[in-house]
UniProtKB/Swiss-Prot annotation:
Known cofactor(s): (R)-lipoate
Domain of life: Bacteria
Protein's UniProt name: Glycine cleavage system H protein
Keyword NAD: no
GO BP, sorted A to Z: glycine decarboxylation via glycine cleavage system
Modified residue annotations for N6-lipoyllysine: K65
GO CC terms of this entry: cytosol; glycine cleavage complex
The family this protein is said to belong to: Belongs to the GcvH family.
Role noted for this protein: The glycine cleavage system catalyzes the degradation of glycine. The H protein shuttles the methylamine group of glycine from the P protein to the T protein.
Organism whose genome encodes this protein: Prochlorococcus marinus (strain MIT 9313)
Cofactor stoichiometry and binding remark: Binds 1 lipoyl cofactor covalently.
Amino acid sequence: MAFQFPDHFRFADTHEYASLDGELVRIGISAFAVDQLGDIVFVDLPEVGDRLNRGTTFGSVESVKAVEDLHAPISGELVRINESVLSSPDELQNDPHGEGWLLVVRPADPAQLQDLMDAATYANKVAIESSN
């Protein structure tokens, strides 16, 4: 299956994305990760005001197949969570790159975004993982 990833997104090895929106960064999980999980039944996210540290676990997504930890692609202060994903996980399932975003962070160091993969590099990674 071929996936489309927005050009302005940056991706972590663990399949989370970060999208710069002004001074804030929107974080979610990629369509590839959602596809691998299957039907999502529960999403666990931290509280507004919490601090995320790049590479550390900040929540989880539970599907009928597995529970997967979510890892922060960048460090920063959590300023908003997507409440609708908590109450209706199918929003994450149906539109992971749009209405299914997870949180918004005020980045501690916006330069950390440059350490993440661009969409083309991530698409290549996904193609390799899909063929294994």
